[in-house]
UniProtKB/Swiss-Prot annotation:
Component of the exocyst complex involved in the docking of exocytic vesicles with fusion sites on the plasma membrane. Together with RAB11A, RAB3IP, RAB8A, PARD3, PRKCI, ANXA2, CDC42 and DNMBP promotes transcytosis of PODXL to the apical membrane initiation sites (AMIS), apical surface formation and lumenogenesis. The keyword rRNA processing does not apply. Keywords: Cell projection, Cytoplasm, Exocytosis, Protein transport, Transport. It is found in: Cytoplasm; Cytoplasm, Perinuclear region; Cell projection, Growth cone; Midbody, Midbody ring. InterPro entries: EXOC6/Sec15, EXOC6/Sec15_C, EXOC6/Sec15_C_dom1, EXOC6_Sec15_N, EXOC6PINT-1/Sec15/Tip20_C_dom2. This is Exocyst complex component 6. One of its GO terms (biological process) is membrane fission. The keyword NAD does not apply. GO terms for cellular component: cytosol; exocyst; Flemming body; growth cone; perinuclear region of cytoplasm; plasma membrane. The exocyst complex is composed of EXOC1, EXOC2, EXOC3, EXOC4, EXOC5, EXOC6, EXOC7 and EXOC8. Interacts with CNTRL. Interacts with RAB11A in a GTP-dependent manner. Belongs to the SEC15 family.
Amino acid sequence: MAENSESLGTVPEHERILQEIESTDTACVGPTLRSVYDDQPNAHKKFMEKLDACIRNHDKEIEKMCNFHHQGFVDAITELLKVRTDAEKLKVQVTDTNRRFQDAGKEVIVHTEDIIRCRIQQRNITTVVEKLQLCLPVLEMYSKLKEQMSAKRYYSALKTMEQLENVYFPWVSQYRFCQLMIENLPKLREDIKEISMSDLKDFLESIRKHSDKIGETAMKQAQHQKTFSVSLQKQNKMKFGKNMYINRDRIPEERNETVLKHSLEEEDENEEEILTVQDLVDFSPVYRCLHIYSVLGDEETFENYYRKQRKKQARLVLQPQSNMHETVDGYRRYFTQIVGFFVVEDHILHVTQGLVTRAYTDELWNMALSKIIAVLRAHSSYCTDPDLVLELKNLTVIFADTLQGYGFPVNRLFDLLFEIRDQYNETLLKKWAGVFRDIFEEDNYSPIPVVNEEEYKIVISKFPFQDPDLEKQSFPKKFPMSQSVPHIYIQVKEFIYASLKFSESLHRSSTEIDDMLRKSTNLLLTRTLSSCLLNLIRKPHIGLTELVQIIINTTHLEQACKYLEDFITNITNISQETVHTTRLYGLSTFKDARHAAEGEIYTKLNQKIDEFVQLADYDWTMSEPDGRASGYLMDLINFLRSIFQVFTHLPGKVAQTACMSACQHLSTSLMQMLLDSELKQISMGAVQQFNLDVIQCELFASSEPVPGFQGDTLQLAFIDLRQLLDLFMVWDWSTYLADYGQPASKYLRVNPNTALTLLEKMKDTSKKNNIFAQFRKNDRDKQKLIETVVKQLRSLVNGMSQHM
């Protein structure tokens, strides 16, 4: 029962499998058959049985079908056999037709192949044309690039390269020639860089050579503009009725207008002739090189190279020649090169972007300015010619004004000019020292004579002299001063003008200029003129008459100082009442010179007295005096009288001092003559003769050779001699010794040492002519008295030395 139930269950399954096999593609039968074996054991046998049964069913169906269609098949075969004969005939016909068709189509095939070949060629040509149309623009651009390179149009060439790389090469990048072009472009760029850099180097060398011409042109232009402005200012001043002074002479207004008109016309002509920096230098290499490096993306390299090279050139330009200080052309060449350098840099700054910056030019200018100041300070110190220093100042002002017009700060240059101004004044002082020396050498040191009104006015026009008494005198007459006074006055004014020349164009106020003029004039008076006067006074050949005239001259020069102050005031238009106005020190200068001259008068006078005294020829052993004064002394007194008459033109105090000094010196000289250590013995006759000479000196003193002495003041110069001689002449030793040291002593001025020295010279020791020889014969008691006096005098001398 169980087996039957299992068999019943497998039958539907086997039918399903068979249906699946019949309806499924043979490729998928494998899994279906595998399921037969995966089922129950012996299931495949049952399946085989079922399969055999199914096959038998199908065979039966086929057999039924064949039996049904068999007659039709037989009929079809019969029909087919009948058609077979016709088919063979048709085959023969078709074969013949085919042969004939093949024979006929051989030419067509040949022509067709030709057509195909032509079509292929046509297609290839079309393709080539299309490719060539792509390549031709590239080749044309590359050819254009070559032409631009040949024509040195490098910036355009670089632009063409950019177009080739960005537009044209992508179209034909697959072709070999394009790769060659692409590989060649970097080399062309490097060539362009090298060529443009070479052009830049040539440009830098060119502007280095032309810097002086560029600077000269720029400085001329600045000078013309300044002159034009000054001319306009003068013209405007004339319109307002202001008086114009050119140099020292006042020029009428009509002449001024003519001069200014001519000046303006000349300025217009000069401006037309002036070239600009663009006219002198071709800047295209710089622009071209800058654009090229900008296109190449290497602008920073170009800027660094340009700035580095220009700094090197700046150092070369700023290096002066060793002999630059010898001529103004050396300074001019130095300035023009520097101006040319910075004019080029300023032009580059304004026409390019980034190549030169304001910070860079300022740094370069500050470096250059420090070097320029150091160079000018060093080289100007070698200048000894004031004209050269003045030309250097004018050049420096034009140099500063030129660069200031281009925006460079130049205040330090004007500060330097103030330093150079001190040096300029020093050179002026040295020059005027020579001028003053020449004036003093040429002066005859005698009053200026004038014989008519014309000569009188000429002197008055040169020197501000006012004397109503002299004006009233009839011709011929004489000015009290000598010829050097108006010459000195004129030269002082010339010095002021020369000093003013340097102060012009320094952008300083009138007050500062006035102060500078007064200070420089003070230096001229207190140092140069004073030194020249002192040297003149001390010269050996200057005599007493000349010294007297020098004192008179200094008096008039001192009085003229106020006119010099007015002269400076008229130039600067600064009132003397201004608080900070410097006063001229001429008063003290001429006072010092006058005092020196007075002292030299005293010295010269004493020297002259010494010369007369040296002529003294006393016979110190004479027994009796000659009865008259010595000849040398009378000559001396006559000389002193004539000299003191000349002193009447001097101030009274000077003449009195000179007279007193002369008498004191004469008294001292006579005293020294008596006490001379080489004089061993003196006779009483010699003393009496000497007394006669002293009496003449006292008579001269009492005759009042110079007015103004009170009483016997001048005679007191000989009081020492008088008391000494009276003591020996009267032989009043008892009174001298008794009253010694008393204020009311008759011989108060006689020094014991002096008396002892003279007494010993008169004492007879061993010589037969001794004055005391007769005493030993006639009166030995008196001899003892003398010995006693000598001992007492020595005692007084020793007492004095102990107190000292």
